[in-house]
A protein has these predicted regions:
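Glycine-rich anion-binding loops of enzyme active sites
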Residues: 1-33, 104, 108, 122-125
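A general structural motif
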Residues: 5-10, 39-47, 88-91
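Short acidic, glycine/serine/threonine-rich loops at helix termini
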Residues: 12-17, 29-30, 35-39, 72-76, ...
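Intrinsic low-complexity, intrinsically disordered segments enriched in polar/basic residues
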Residues: 13-14, 44, 163
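A glycine- and small/hydrophobic-rich beta-loop-beta segment
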Residues: 19, 24-30, 35-60
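Glycine-/charge-enriched secondary-structure boundary and capping motifs
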Residues: 47, 51-168
């Protein structure tokens, strides 16, 4: 388990869950060198731009990409408000599964995408349907949540079959 703490104005902080059907999802990768190491001078510029877009209310939600790639990030973003995603036809599976540590998936309104001003890959569109659509493949949100919860269900059960006490 790890976590980080920082100080910020609450008005400058966003949450990771998807906000609205019709919004676009974009993967923003940090610049890396031939050895796949971050080019820190360029990374700083990318992070500064993301921060400005968040403060300006342009980026609606964001999630840091981890070991499960953009696919994991998008799924966890969708779980919060139970919104679905249709991935763009141009997106390949490797675009979604490559870890790309230090990078982000961001949600923006369609009308604001041109304001990004940093390289990004359009991943797809947020929908109000409770499913993920990638080409001909469809996974319901319920299936995805159940699969996500399953590994730790025995350790941290989300429900019990014990006696229920009704309190007046």
């Amino acid at each position: 388990v790890s976590f980080a703490v920082d100080v910020a104005k609450t008005t400058d902080v966003i949450t990771p869950e998807l906000k609205r059907a019709g919004n676009r999802l974009i993967r923003i990768c940090i610049p890396t060198d031939a050895y796949n190491l971050p080019i820190y001078s360029e990374v700083k510029k990318v992070y500064q731009r993301i921060t400005k877009l968040i403060k300006d209310g342009i980026i609606k939600s964001a999630y840091a990409i981890g070991g499960g790639g953009a696919l994991e990030a998008v799924a966890k973003m969708a779980f919060g408000n139970k919104l679905g995603v249709i991935f763009d036809e141009e997106v390949e599976l490797k675009d979604l599964t490559d870890p790309k540590f230090g990078s982000f998936v961001v949600e923006m309104s369609t009308r604001d995408v041109h304001k990004l001003a940093i390289p990004g890959l359009m991943l797809g569109e947020v929908t109000d349907k409770h499913e993920f659509v990638f080409g001909d493949e469809v996974v319901t949100l319920e299936e995805a949540i159940d699969t996500w919860k399953k590994p730790l269900e025995k350790v941290f059960p989300t429900s019990s079959e014990g006696d229920q006490i009704i309190v007046d």
